[in-house]
Structures are given as C-alpha cells and as structure tokens.
Regions:
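An N-terminal-biased, well-structured beta-alpha scaffold segment characteristic
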Residues: 1-81
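Phosphate-binding beta-alpha-beta segment of Rossmann-like dinucleotide-binding domains, i.e.
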Residues: 79-113
Length: 113
C-alpha cells in the first residue's frame, strides 16, 4: 500500500497525465500539446475554432452517440481518431421503455392515486 495519498502505487511510475479542464472559450489554450480530448458539449463549435492549436491531438472521444455536429473537413482529413458513446445507453433506454409500457398497460397512474 501507499504511505500517503500522494504516493504513487508500485509499478505505476510510467503513468502520468496532464489533465486540463476548460469551457469552450478556453479550449484553444487547453488543447495545445494535448494528445486526447474528451468532449461533453457536442453541439459546440469550439473544436473547429481551436483546430489550429491542436498540434498533437490524436484522439477525440465524444460522450454522445452521434458525431455529426463535431465533424468538419479539417478533422475528417486528419489522422485524429474520433470515438463516441454509441451503445452505452441501449440497455437503460430499453429498460425504461419496457417499464413505461408495463406501467401504461397496468394503468399504474390510477393505481397510485
């Protein structure tokens, strides 16, 4: 075990990360030198606007199922890998729909009153 919370566990000496968090207006500065980008706001044009500063970018992961709003010509023509969260919501969404169908079929709204 580690002596204190700041000690690195044994065998992980080679793992280091420079984590940067920013809003859309700070992406141009934050993406400079970054190798990966995790994108939450998939409707934002921030990646397109900051593209010239993305000098080492290798991977963009978008936390949505679609990537249509992210894609632009320069990104398509680059070697940057784009991944998404396709399939992550399949099971929870199916479970919700099934529950809603059962609740409707059993007239649950009146049953709870």
């Amino acid at each position: 075990m580690c002596e204190k919370a700041t000690d690195r566990p044994p065998g992980l000496d080679g793992l280091e990360v420079d984590f940067r968090y920013c809003a859309a207006d700070g992406l141009a500065d934050a993406v400079r030198g970054a190798r990966a980008l995790l994108l939450w706001d998939f409707f934002s044009r921030a990646v397109r606007d900051a593209w010239q500063q993305a000098d080492r970018l290798e991977w963009i992961h978008i936390t949505a199922a679609g990537v249509d709003t992210l894609l632009f010509d320069e990104l398509r023509d680059s070697d940057v890998v784009v991944t998404n969260a396709r399939g992550v919501f399949d099971r929870p969404l199916a479970e919700y729909v099934l529950g809603a169908v059962i609740a409707y079929a059993k007239d649950s709204l009146r049953s709870f009153d």
